[in-house]
């Protein structure tokens, strides 16, 4: 007992020293923490002061910069206003000057016109009436003649066309029959060649599939038999293991129950001894602590008094701070309310002004646009009027000149009496005519040269434009093809990569799973072994302790041991009987369970099999659906793209037409406006951008700086709080250990305080949230009100504007009607004047020009007739071509359907084979999976057996050790006298024996582990060899199959390539034949042209000789007819002149009255218009100045409000930061005080408790010890419970506080983000406005350039096309003329011969023959001379025609060569890309097959073949679509060309008729 007491004393001294050391360390830490916090706060205060000084400096500098910027802006605005005023003044002065000049010129012209108008009218009206009557009668006669001739020609034309069509139809049917026979022969030959290999391939495939199915079936049968055997074996083993396991569990539970009872009894005895020792130790500790507590009480009292005084001072301080904060809050609230009211008022004013300015701007823009449109319309009308005036001036000049000539003519007429004067005037007239004809010839030569030069230039431009268009089209087609190929490659790559990644992930997952399973098994084994070792060591320790305690009390327990042995014996006998009964019951239960489990397993297997079949069927269905969906989606995509392309083309055409119309209207006005405003806008934009960017960068820098400072402060605060929180946690842990009692009281107070704070925060937060909502609602209502008012104002302005616009439109319509009526009257007057002049002039040269006109009319009529014939021929050709194309497309579609059918049969065959393969692979996988499961089960079984043996060995060892302990205890009881010596010796012996046994166990385990490893290695070798054999066999099978598939694929590829080559060869052959035909046709045409020219020359010579004779006869007849016509004509002329004079006088009177009334109206309108223009200009200037002033004021208000808002935001941020810092600082102080108070309170309670314990200890020591233990446990439990109860609300409050702070920070962030967004949006709007202006100017310029380029290209194409049409029409007319000449010549010769034969008798035949021979001999020289001249003329004509045709041919051949080259390059590039793509795909597939050959090589190869097949099918389909698209494009171009040709012909006819009318009007 003395030794124990000394030990306890020693340990108590150590504890006291440790406690004092901990107290000292904690106090030192507190002082250190206090000093550090004071230093930190002081440094933060200094930093804050420096930041405030910097902010004040920055604020003053920014105010100075703002003031300077405002002054500069004001100066700039004043200068801009001055510049605009000067420009307006200059423009108005120039406009007024221009108007004055125009008005003066108009007045002069009008006065001159009025002076000469009345003099002219009478004569002109008379002559016009005469000429109109003449022309009308002539026109009627010509019309009747034309109708008759056209009807005759149309009948001839249709009959000839019918004959030609019939002949061509017969030729076409013959060719078609021959082609069909050739195709049938070729197909038969091809089918005959392919029949044998296809049949052989089918037989081989059937045999191969049969063999594969047989092998699979036999393998499956063997595997299923083996699996069934293994499963049954496994079931029997499981039954046996369950029985064995149950027996072992029952044994262990029974033994554990017996051992637990023994341990419980011993534990109760040791517990009572330990309680006695604890009570003694606590009494000693209490006595020692009393002296220490007395000294500490004095210190605590002094600390407590200081704490109380400090607390009172702090409470007063807190109250004053709170009062100050409330007062400040009220002041700031008042300021904020006042500022808010002012801000809202400013915002309302600003928004209203802004909206008014916006509406004003919109109205001004609309007004400007209306003014612009009005100006444009007025300008257009003025230009139109000027043109009309110019025409009127020209007509007046012509009338004036004509009047002069008329006067001259009248003078000459008066001098008819004098013959000499008349003769001289006649000679002068003849000379003038000759001069005029010379001048005309020279002018026509110059015009021809100039037009030729222009045409050559146009041809050059057209060729350049055609080259550009071709290059652009080729580039586009190549890009489209490349993109389509690239997309298909990307799709294939994605599919392949997805498949590859899936396979890699699967393999990795399986490897990881195996590794995890092995690691888990190893880890669990290690864990179990570790646990066993721990249990073994714990058992050893418990045994040693138990033996030490048992050695003292062994004698007492011998009786109880004997009784226990007897009880155990009886219990063992009863337990044995129960065990036997239990085993029998268990055996019967297990049999029933095994039967039931077998039944359930069979049911599950059947269900799994059915489920697998259903899943496979659904999977196949899914695969088919997926393929069908892909095909459907592809078809829909193609349709969609085609329709989109078609609609896009139509829309593009419409857009181009509308754009061209709009651009022609806009370009005139915009050109003038843009050039004026671009300079001013550029300069203004540059200055504004530079200033704005500088301002923006400064603003951003200030914002970033302020945000960085706030973030730094926030981050430092967080760091400080984290550090303080860590220190607080450390202090809290130490305080919990020392001050358990005081904490409860302090925690309650702290919780009350926190509860008050939380309620205060909640109230503030609740106040803040509705306030924010109220502000948002108020802002929204203000915005809605402003918008609504603006909308109403806009509506009113819109209504006013519409009224004004309606009135303006009515006025404009009336004015335009008046103007149009005036112009029509003027035109009518001018037309009557022109007609009178024309009739007067035509009286002199009417007869001579009638002849020329009839010739031209005949030529035109023949040309029209030939054109109609050619058009009908073209229509027939077109219909035949369309029919041939339809037949060819049908044949192509049939071929494609056949290929698709063959491909579908192949796909179905392959797919069925693939499905059979998949079924086999699924069965194979299930078999492998069952094998793996079975092997894993065997391994787990062996492992469980090993663990059971290990557990059994441990139990045997433990039972053996128990027996040994009991034996040793008996020996120890006998040797009670020599307890210490024998016990020590026995302990050493036992330790040695335990080590020996442990070493034996370790050796056994090691040997067992080694044997297991050897068995595992042997099994792995066998498995590896089996796997290698299986892999080799499978590889051999797959290689064979791959070879067969490879050869079949090569065969298919070769056949398919040969088919493609054949098709390409046929297409190239057709193209070559087509080109050859064209070339031969051109050569034949040239040859025929030469022949025709020769014949034409001969016909011309014959016609000239014939016409000479006919002209002599006609002249005589015409001379007689002319005398009669002149007499009748003179009589008719005198009758008509009287009527025309009468009508003319009436018309002149009417025109003069209307002219006087219109003149008065015009003068009134011009005066009103001038006054309105002056008023508008003054009003616009005034309004512009007002707008500028308002904008300037609004900008100043916005800047001031924005700066105020910025300063207010900064102030709020600083206020928020200071509040957070103050709250943190106060919370830290409160925590520190609370900790000090808890320490003092605990020390007091400890002193009181120790003092009470010392007083009561003398009376009842044993009772007090037990009561202290109970009280201690109860108090600890209660305190813990109370602490946990209080901790939950504190934690919830802390969380809420954290959430509130987070919400506050989020609100601040939201405000900042909203403000930044507002800034960014405003900047973007400004930028967007500037960009839209620049874009509009740029687009206008670009559209103008684009329109000009398009216009030039279209003009070039039109010219080129017109040339081509002209040459074609000339050629066709030439051929028709050639035929007609031949027919005429043949008829003429026949007629001549028949006449001669009739007239000449037989007797004179010899003389005629002699004379003809002499005549032939004489005329031979003349013929040769004429022929040589004709040949020269023909050569010259041929050379000119050949030059034109060669140029055209060369251009066409170049274009054809370039198209062919491009097509060949495209085909070669296509083939190369296809080859590259196929090679890449094959390489990827080979790599994949090579990597996965062991797993599923056959499946991969089949997939590759199917992929290739699908890819080729897709490629052929795509090629077919491309060819089809190209054919459609060519057809469209050809149709457009033909329609353009027709339009050109119509245009030429109209143009020729217009030229004839103009020539007639002009008198040439």
UniProtKB/Swiss-Prot annotation:
GO terms for biological process: cell division. One of its GO terms (molecular function) is calmodulin binding. SUPFAM superfamilies: P-loop containing nucleoside triphosphate hydrolases. Probable role in mitotic spindle regulation and coordination of mitotic processes. May have a preferential role in regulating neurogenesis. Pfam families: IQ. This is Abnormal spindle-like microcephaly-associated protein homolog. It comes from the Eukaryota. Its main location: cytoplasm. GO terms for cellular component: cytoplasm; nucleus. InterPro entries: CellDiv_DevSignal_Domain (IPR052318), IQ_motif_EF-hand-BS (IPR000048), P-loop_NTPase (IPR027417). The lineage of its organism: Eukaryota, Metazoa, Chordata, Craniata, Vertebrata. Keywords: Calmodulin-binding, Cell cycle, Cell division, Cytoplasm, Mitosis, Nucleus, Repeat. Residues 31-60, 220-251, 270-299, 293-322, 366-395, 389-420, 439-468, 462-491, 512-541, 535-566, 608-639, 658-687, 681-712, 731-762, 754-785, 804-835, 827-856, 877-908, 900-931, 949-980, 972-1003, 1022-1053, 1045-1076, 1095-1126, 1168-1199, 1304-1333, 1327-1358, 1377-1406, 1452-1483, 1474-1503, 1500-1531 form the IQ domain. SMART domains: IQ (SM00015). It comes from Ateles geoffroyi. PANTHER family: ABNORMAL SPINDLE-LIKE MICROCEPHALY-ASSOCIATED PROTEIN (PTHR22590:SF4), MYOSIN MOTOR DOMAIN-CONTAINING PROTEIN (PTHR22590). It is found in: Cytoplasm; Nucleus.
């Amino acid at each position: 007992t003395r030794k124990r007491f000394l030990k306890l004393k020693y340990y108590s001294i150590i504890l006291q020293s440790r406690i004092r050391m901990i107290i000292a360390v904690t106090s030192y830490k507190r002082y250190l923490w206090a000093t550090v916090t004071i230093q930190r706060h002081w440094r933060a205060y200094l930093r804050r002061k420096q930041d405030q000084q910097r902010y004040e400096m920055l604020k003053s500098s920014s105010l100075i910069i703002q003031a300077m910027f405002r002054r500069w802006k004001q100066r700039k605005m004043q200068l801009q206003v001055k510049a605009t005023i000067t420009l307006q003044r200059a423009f108005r002065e120039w406009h007024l000057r221009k108007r004055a000049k125009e008005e003066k010129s108009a007045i002069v012209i009008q006065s001159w016109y009025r002076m000469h108008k009345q003099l002219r009218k009478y004569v002109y009206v008379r002559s016009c009436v005469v000429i109109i009557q003449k022309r009308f009668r002539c026109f009627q006669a010509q019309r009747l003649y034309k109708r008759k001739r056209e009807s005759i020609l149309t009948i001839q034309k249709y009959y000839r066309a019918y004959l030609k069509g019939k002949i061509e139809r017969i030729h076409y049917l013959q060719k078609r029959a021959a082609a069909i026979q050739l195709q049938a022969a070729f197909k038969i030959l091809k089918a005959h060649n392919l029949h044998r290999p296809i049949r052989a391939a089918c037989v081989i495939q059937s045999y191969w599939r049969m063999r594969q199915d047989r092998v699979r079936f036999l393998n499956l049968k063997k595997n299923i038999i083996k699996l069934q055997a293994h499963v049954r074996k496994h079931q029997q083993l499981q039954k046996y293991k369950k029985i064995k396991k149950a027996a072992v569990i029952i044994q262990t539970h029974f033994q554990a129950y017996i051992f637990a009872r023994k341990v419980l009894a011993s534990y109760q005895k040791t517990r009572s001894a330990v309680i006695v020792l604890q009570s003694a130790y606590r009494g000693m500790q209490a006595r020692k602590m009393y002296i220490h507590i007395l000294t500490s009480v004095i210190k605590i009292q002094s600390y407590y008094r200081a704490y109380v005084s400090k607390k009172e001072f702090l409470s007063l301080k807190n109250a004053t701070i709170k009062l100050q904060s409330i007062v400040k809050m009220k002041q700031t609230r008042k300021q904020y309310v006042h500022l808010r009211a002012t801000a809202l008022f400013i915002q309302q004013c600003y928004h209203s002004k802004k909206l008014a300015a916006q509406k004003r701007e919109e109205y001004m823009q609309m007004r400007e646009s209306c003014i612009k449109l009005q100006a444009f319309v007025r300008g257009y009308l003025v230009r139109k009027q000027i043109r009309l005036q110019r025409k009127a001036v020209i007509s007046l000049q012509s009338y004036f000149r004509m009047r002069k000539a008329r006067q001259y003519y009248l003078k000459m007429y008066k001098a008819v009496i004098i013959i000499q004067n008349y003769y001289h005037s006649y000679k002068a007239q003849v000379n003038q005519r000759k001069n005029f004809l010379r001048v005309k010839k020279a002018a026509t030569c110059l015009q021809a040269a100039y037009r030729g030069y222009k045409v050559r230039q146009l041809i050059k431009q057209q060729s350049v434009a055609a080259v550009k268009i071709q290059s652009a089209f080729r580039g586009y087609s190549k890009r489209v093809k490349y993109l389509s190929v690239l997309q298909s490659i990307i799709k294939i790559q994605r599919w392949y990569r997805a498949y590859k990644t899936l396979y890699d992930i699967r393999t990795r997952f399986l490897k990881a799973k195996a590794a995890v399973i092995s690691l888990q098994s190893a880890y669990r084994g290690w864990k179990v072994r570790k646990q066993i070792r721990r249990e073994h060591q714990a058992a050893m320790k418990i045994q040693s302790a138990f033996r030490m305690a048992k050695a003292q009390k062994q004698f007492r327990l011998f009786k109880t041991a004997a009784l226990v042995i007897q009880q155990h014996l009886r219990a063992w006998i009863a337990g044995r009987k129960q065990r036997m009964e239990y085993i029998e019951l268990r055996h019967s239960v297990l049999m029933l369970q095994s039967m039931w489990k077998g039944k359930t397993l069979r049911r599950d297997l059947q269900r799994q099999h059915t489920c697998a079949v259903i899943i496979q069927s659904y999977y196949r269905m899914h695969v088919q659906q997926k393929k069908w969906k892909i095909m459907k989606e592809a078809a829909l995509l193609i349709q969609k793209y085609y329709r989109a392309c078609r609609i896009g083309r139509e829309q593009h055409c419409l857009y181009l037409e509308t754009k061209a119309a709009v651009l022609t209207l806009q370009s005139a006005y915009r050109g003038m406006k843009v050039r004026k405003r671009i300079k001013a806008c550029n300069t203004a934009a540059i200055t504004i951008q530079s200033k704005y960017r500088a301002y923006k960068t400064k603003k951003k820098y200030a914002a970033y700086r302020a945000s960085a400072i706030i973030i730094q402060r926030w981050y430092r605060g967080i760091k400080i709080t984290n550090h303080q929180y860590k220190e607080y946690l450390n202090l809290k842990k130490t305080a919990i250990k020392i001050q358990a009692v005081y904490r409860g009281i302090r925690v309650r107070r702290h919780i009350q305080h926190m509860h008050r704070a939380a309620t205060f925060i909640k109230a503030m937060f609740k106040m803040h949230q509705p306030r924010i909502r109220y502000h948002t609602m108020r802002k929204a209502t203000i915005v809605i009100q402003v918008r609504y008012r603006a909308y109403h104002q806009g509506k009113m302005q819109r209504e006013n504007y519409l009224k004004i616009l309606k009135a303006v439109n009515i006025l404009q319509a009336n004015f335009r009607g008046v103007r149009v009526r005036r112009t029509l009257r003027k035109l009518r007057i001018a037309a009557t004047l022109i007609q009178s002049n024309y009739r007067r002039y035509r009286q002199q040269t009417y007869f001579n020009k009638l002849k020329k006109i009839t010739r031209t009319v005949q030529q035109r009529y023949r040309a029209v007739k030939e054109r109609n014939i050619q058009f009908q021929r073209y229509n027939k050709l077109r219909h035949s071509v369309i029919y041939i194309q339809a037949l060819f497309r049908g044949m192509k579609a049939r071929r494609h359907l056949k290929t698709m059918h063959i491909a579908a049969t192949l796909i179905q065959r392959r797919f069925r084979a693939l499905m059979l393969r998949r079924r086999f692979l699924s069965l194979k996988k299930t078999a492998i999976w069952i094998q793996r499961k079975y092997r894993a089960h065997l391994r787990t079984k062996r492992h469980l057996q090993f663990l059971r043996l290990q557990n059994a060995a441990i139990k045997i060892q433990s039972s053996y050790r128990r027996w040994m302990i009991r034996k040793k205890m008996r020996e120890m009881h006998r040797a009670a006298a020599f307890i210490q010596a024998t016990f020590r010796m026995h302990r050493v012996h036992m330790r040695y024996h335990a080590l020996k046994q442990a070493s034996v166990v370790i050796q056994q385990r090691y040997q067992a582990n080694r044997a297991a490893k050897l068995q595992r290695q042997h099994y792995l070798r066998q498995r590896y060899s089996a796997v290698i054999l299986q892999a080799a066999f499978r590889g051999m099978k797959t290689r064979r199959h791959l070879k067969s598939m490879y050869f079949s694929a090569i065969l298919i590829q070769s056949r398919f390539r040969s088919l493609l080559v054949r098709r390409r060869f046929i297409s190239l052959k057709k193209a070559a034949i087509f080109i050859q035909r064209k070339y031969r046709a051109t050569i034949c045409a040239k040859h025929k042209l030469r022949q025709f020219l020769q014949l034409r020359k001969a016909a011309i010579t014959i016609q000239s000789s014939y016409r000479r004779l006919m002209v002599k006869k006609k002249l005589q007849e015409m001379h007689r007819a002319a005398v009669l016509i002149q007499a009748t004509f003179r009589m008719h002329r005198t009758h008509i002149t009287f009527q025309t004079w009468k009508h003319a006088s009436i018309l002149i009177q009417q025109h003069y009255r209307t002219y006087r009334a219109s003149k008065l109206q015009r003068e009134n309108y011009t005066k009103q218009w001038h006054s309105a223009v002056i008023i508008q200009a003054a009003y616009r200037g005034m309004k512009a100045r007002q707008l500028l002033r308002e904008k300037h004021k609004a900008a100043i208000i916005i800047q001031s409000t924005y700066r105020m808002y910025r300063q207010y935001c900064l102030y709020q941020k600083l206020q928020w930061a200071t509040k957070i810092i103050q709250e943190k600082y106060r919370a830290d102080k409160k925590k520190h005080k609370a900790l000090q108070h808890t320490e003092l309170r605990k020390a007091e309670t400890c002193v009181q408790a120790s003092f009470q314990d010392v007083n009561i200890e003398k009376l009842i020591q044993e009772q007090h010890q037990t009561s202290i233990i109970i009280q201690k446990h109860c108090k600890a439990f209660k305190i813990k419970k109370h602490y946990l109860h209080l901790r939950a609300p504190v934690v919830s409050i802390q969380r809420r506080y954290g959430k509130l702070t987070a919400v506050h920070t989020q609100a601040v962030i939201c405000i900042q983000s909203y403000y930044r967004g507002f800034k960014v949006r405003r900047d973007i709007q400004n930028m967007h406005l500037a960009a839209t202006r620049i874009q509009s100017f740029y687009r206008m310029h670009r559209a103008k350039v684009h329109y000009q380029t398009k216009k030039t290209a279209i003009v070039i194409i039109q010219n080129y096309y017109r040339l081509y049409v002209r040459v074609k029409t000339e050629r066709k007319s030439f051929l028709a003329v050639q035929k007609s000449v031949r027919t005429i010549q043949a008829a003429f010769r026949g007629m001549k011969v028949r006449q001669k034969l009739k007239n000449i008798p037989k007797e004179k035949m010899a003389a005629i023959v002699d004379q003809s021979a002499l005549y032939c001999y004489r005329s031979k020289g003349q013929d040769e001379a004429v022929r040589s001249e004709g040949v020269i003329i023909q050569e010259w004509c041929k050379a000119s025609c050949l030059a034109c045709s060669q140029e055209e041919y060369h251009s066409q051949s170049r274009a054809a060569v370039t198209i062919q080259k491009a097509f060949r390059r495209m085909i070669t590039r296509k083939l190369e890309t296809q080859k590259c793509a196929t090679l890449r795909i094959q390489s990827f597939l080979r790599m994949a097959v090579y990597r996965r050959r062991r797993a599923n090589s056959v499946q991969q190869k089949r997939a590759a073949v199917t992929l290739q097949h699908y890819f080729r099918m897709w490629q052929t389909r795509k090629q077919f679509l491309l060819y089809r698209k190209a054919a459609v494009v060519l057809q469209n171009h050809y149709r457009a060309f033909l329609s353009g040709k027709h339009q050109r012909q119509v245009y030429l006819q109209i143009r020729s008729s217009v030229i004839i009318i103009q020539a007639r009007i002009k008198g040439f």
